[in-house]
Regions:
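N-terminal glycine-rich FAD/FM-binding segment characteristic of electron-transfer flavoproteins
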Residues: 1-346
Length: 346
């Protein structure tokens, strides 16, 4: 009989992040499809009662908690000790956790300590004929595979954005506190602050309703024989600021640089979605470049509506892949779009 443990950490305000609720949904779905299994929840943070109460109506039979100021910040030593203590208290065989940066660096080490196995970047969890299986992407996101393991414990990191969040109702949860004895050495690392881009400078927004993909044409020579990189930067950032869209890039920075092209300064390797299909993870799936010039990229089929801008009305990829094709200059189209967005926002 499997005992499924959902591990989650609280946010600074004591709440549970969306990624934690997504992991809980995946675990609850697995519990439902696995006869005789038990579902328990383990929470870590400065104060976890509010978080536990917010999911009190979920099908978990027991709640475990590790609390204290030492567990409010992300730190490998304390997080690993807390996860191990909760695991032992719950007598779990399967552990499901959101693959946040905090858990992603901790769970493999905890699995090693406990003689188990860990799988990361999992996008689906299920069971058939009493066997648990997980789904994840391989070979630069071009192939999806399903795998099972007999080794226990099994630690599963669920990719944020791959599952719907659990809609568990609130109530009053009874939490069994687990004591963790920490040494001074385990508390040497201290988080002194967080450096992050301003909201307007953030270009990767997984929850956005729109994915805007910059093709390589933005930095190529235009109709006048010149490049207009500063203008392209202004148009793209202006659109992102007003639409709150997520930004993707169809070609890698290495490819662009190798071809002697200028690189838009706000793009990073995290924005690339073309051949690697890695990030950003969009709510509707992954996408390829704006007119689908890379047909081997998986995920293009998941986008609900695909719109492309191309000066070539006979562009085969645009005609074959796009739902709506604008035969026009992208600079002019986006300038008009920004103008309309500004007028609508005013």
């Amino acid at each position: 009989m499997e005992t499924i443990l959902v591990l989650a950490h609280t946010e600074n305000d004591g709440s549970l992040a969306k990624s934690a609720r997504e992991a809980l949904h995946a675990a609850a779905t697995l519990h439902k499809s696995l006869a005789g299994s038990k579902l328990v929840v383990g929470l870590i943070g400065d104060n976890i009662q509010t978080a536990a109460n917010s999911i009190a109506a979920c099908p978990a039979t027991k709640y475990f908690g590790v609390t204290g100021a030492e567990f409010s910040q992300s730190r490998y030593a304390t997080d690993a000790a807390a996860a191990e203590a909760i695991f032992k208290a719950a007598a779990a065989t399967v552990v499901v956790a959101p693959a946040t940066s905090r858990w992603a660096r901790v769970l493999p080490g905890v699995a090693q300590r406990l003689g188990g196995r860990a799988d990361t970047h999992v996008t689906g969890v299920g069971a058939a004929d009493g066997k648990i299986s997980v789904n994840r992407w391989y070979y630069r996101q071009r192939m999806e595979g399903a795998l099972t393991r007999t080794q226990r414990p099994w630690f599963i990191g669920v990719d944020p954005g791959s599952q719907p969040p659990c809609e568990c109702g609130a109530g009053t949860a009874s939490v069994e506190m687990v004591t963790v004895n920490l040494t001074d050495a385990s508390k040497r690392t201290t988080v002194v602050g967080i450096r992050e881009p301003k909201a307007d400078a953030q270009t990767i927004r997984p929850d956005a309703q729109l994915l805007f993909v910059t093709g390589a044409g933005w930095t190529k020579k235009q109709a006048d024989g010149q490049t207009h990189v500063p203008e392209a930067e202004k148009l793209i950032l202006g659109f992102l600021k007003q639409s709150r869209a997520s930004l993707g890039s169809s070609k890698s920075l290495v490819d662009l640089g190798g071809e002697g092209q200028a690189v838009l300064p706000f793009l990073s390797h995290l924005n690339q979605i073309g051949q690697t299909g890695a990030t950003p993870r969009h709510a509707k799936g992954l996408s390829t470049c704006c007119h689908g010039e890379e047909p081997h990229t998986v995920g293009w089929r998941f986008i609900g509506e695909r719109r492309a801008i191309s000066l070539d009305p006979n562009c085969g990829w645009a005609r074959g892949k796009a739902d709506v094709l604008y035969v026009a200059d992208a600079f002019k189209v986006m300038a008009k779009v920004n103008e309309l967005l500004a007028a609508g926002g005013a």
